[in-house]
Amino acid sequence: MSNLSNLRHKLQNGLIASCQPVPGSAMDTPEIVAAMACAALAGGAVGLRIEGISNIRAVRRATDAPIIGIIKRDLPDSEVRITPWLEDIDALSAAGADIIAFDVTCRERPVSVADLYQRARATGCLTMADASNIDDGLLAHHLGIDFIGTTLSGYTQAIVPTEPDLALVTQLAQAGCRVIAEGRYHSPALAAAAISAGAYAVTVGSAITRIEHICGWFCDAIKQCETEKLTEY
């Protein structure tokens, strides 16, 4: 089995932990990101999704587990944020990413999806498409991109849904894609549902690594209960 085939096999039917702290938060340091990554692996995660060069370097020093690397940028002339530039591809590979993920949505972008894919292939890394719908995913699949993620489903519109897009997982899987289900998988039951729907692997982020979000969910539920109690009187 080749190294790339072995890497694909490691992810199959597994959990990928996205260790991306809230920007500027108390957890937002490379050392803490690396610690979160190691803790996730100790809990059974088979891979990691890491943003930023310094974070990827820190995680790579701590583990040889598969890393999906991304760089997020806020561009003045494009809504594309995830790994938009060719130099990002080179930097991610040099930092130690095994898989390079990039936005494949049909939006104005500084570099074409095809060019990003070709540059990533040239580094020897595997590739992952962050798609928003079936058209994005199929375009990426036909280009030859290794993994198709549902990462951006619901995030290219004004109102973000609360539930994950399991229907998109099924559509892509039926089209022959290696689907990485990602986006709003906030419970073990939803992660299992993604595998049942045909996902190759499932990425979970906020529910594992964003303490602020998790605490917020509990606080909101408690406040809702308090409100309901008050309306009874």
Swiss-Prot record:
It comes from the Bacteria. GO terms for cellular component: cytosol. It catalyses: an N-acyl-D-glucosamine 6-phosphate = an N-acyl-D-mannosamine 6-phosphate. Pathway: Amino-sugar metabolism; N-acetylneuraminate degradation; D-fructose 6-phosphate from N-acetylneuraminate: step 3/5. The keyword Protein biosynthesis does not apply. It is an enzyme of class 5 (isomerase). Keywords: Carbohydrate metabolism, Isomerase. Disulfide bonds: none annotated. GO terms for biological process: carbohydrate metabolic process; N-acetylmannosamine catabolic process; N-acetylneuraminate catabolic process. The keyword Isomerase applies. GO terms for molecular function: N-acylglucosamine-6-phosphate 2-epimerase activity. Its EC number is 5.1.3.9. Converts N-acetylmannosamine-6-phosphate (ManNAc-6-P) to N-acetylglucosamine-6-phosphate (GlcNAc-6-P). HAMAP family: ManNAc6P_epimer. Belongs to the NanE family. PANTHER family: N-ACETYLMANNOSAMINE-6-PHOSPHATE 2-EPIMERASE-RELATED (PTHR36204:SF1). This is Putative N-acetylmannosamine-6-phosphate 2-epimerase. It comes from Yersinia pseudotuberculosis serotype O:1b (strain IP 31758).
